[in-house]
UniProtKB/Swiss-Prot annotation:
Protein name per its UniProtKB record: Sulfurtransferase TusD
Localization (cell): Cytoplasm
Record family assignment: Belongs to the DsrE/TusD family.
Natural source organism: Escherichia coli (strain 55989 / EAEC)
Alphabetically ordered keywords of this record: Cytoplasm, Transferase, tRNA processing
Enzyme nomenclature, EC number: 2.8.1.-
Gene: tusD
């Protein structure tokens, strides 16, 4: 079965993103296809390259990045929500005249069209 996940909670502070990550791992372990994860609202904080959890905590941001690298899962973040919360890639940083970018490698700024496409092409869309 083909799945897409929508994450609306930040990497730290709530259980949403952590539960979504564990669900993603379980899907793959059970042989399902996870085509994409769409980060929306506060979920865009999962793509912030500048997070630095304590050394004894799981690094969820890098966990998502590894999911992308190892399994080819698309990690799309809503561009409008990201810009409002200070998450920018190099292109947007240049366009906005910002000194640097902070989008974690493996993540892509996307519009809501990416979520709509996932909704149409996947068997299930699960929101956390």
């Amino acid at each position: 079965m083909r799945f897409a996940i929508v994450v609306t909670g930040p990497a730290y502070g709530t259980q949403q993103a952590s539960s979504a990550f564990q669900f993603a791992q379980a899907l793959i372990a059970e042989g399902h296809e996870l085509s994409s994860v769409f980060f929306y609202r506060e979920g865009v904080y999962n793509a912030n390259q500048l997070t630095s959890p304590a050394s004894d905590e799981f690094d969820l941001v890098r966990g998502w990045q590894q999911l992308n690298a190892q399994h080819g899962v698309a990690l799309n973040i809503c561009v409008a929500a990201a810009l409002r919360r200070g998450i920018v890639d190099e292109t947007e940083a240049g366009r906005l005249g910002l000194a640097s970018s902070n989008l974690q490698p493996g993540f892509t700024l996307s519009g809501l069209g990416a979520l709509a496409e996932a909704s149409l092409t996947c068997d299930r869309v699960v929101q956390f």
